[in-house]
C-alpha cells in the first residue's frame, strides 16, 4: 500500500467532524476537540477509507491527539498488513 498522506487523513477527519483545525492541532483528545464518539467514527472511517483495522491496543489518546500521530498510526498499520 502507498504511504497515506497527511492531506488524505485530514480529508477523512473533516468528513467525520468539521470545524476543527486538524492541520495544526496537537491535543485533539486532551483539549476535547474530539471525544470518544468521534474516535469511534474515525476508526470506522479508517476501515472504510484505507481498509485497515485499528487494534484495541492502538486506541489510545496519543494516537489520536494530532493528525500527524494518526497519520503515523495509519501508515504503520498499512505496513503491518
Where are these regions (language model features)?
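Conserved catalytic core of two-component sensor histidine kinases
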Residues: 40
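Thiotemplate assembly-line natural product biosynthesis machinery
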Residues: 1-21, 72-81
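Phosphopantetheine carrier-protein modules
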Residues: 14-33, 52-60
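Catalytic nucleophile serine of serine hydrolases
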Residues: 36
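AMP-binding/adenylate-forming catalytic domain of the ANL superfamily
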Residues: 57-69
Amino acid at each position: 500500500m502507498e504511504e497515506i498522506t497527511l492531506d488524505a487523513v485530514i480529508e477523512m477527519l473533516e468528513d467525520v467532524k468539521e470545524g476543527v483545525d486538524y492541520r495544526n492541532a496537537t491535543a485533539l483528545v486532551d483539549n476535547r476537540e474530539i471525544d470518544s464518539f468521534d474516535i469511534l467514527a474515525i476508526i470506522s472511517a479508517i476501515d472504510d477509507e484505507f481498509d485497515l483495522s485499528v487494534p484495541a491496543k492502538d486506541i489510545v489518546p496519543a494516537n489520536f491527539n494530532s493528525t500527524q500521530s494518526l497519520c503515523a498510526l495509519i501508515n504503520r498499520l498499512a505496513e503491518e498488513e
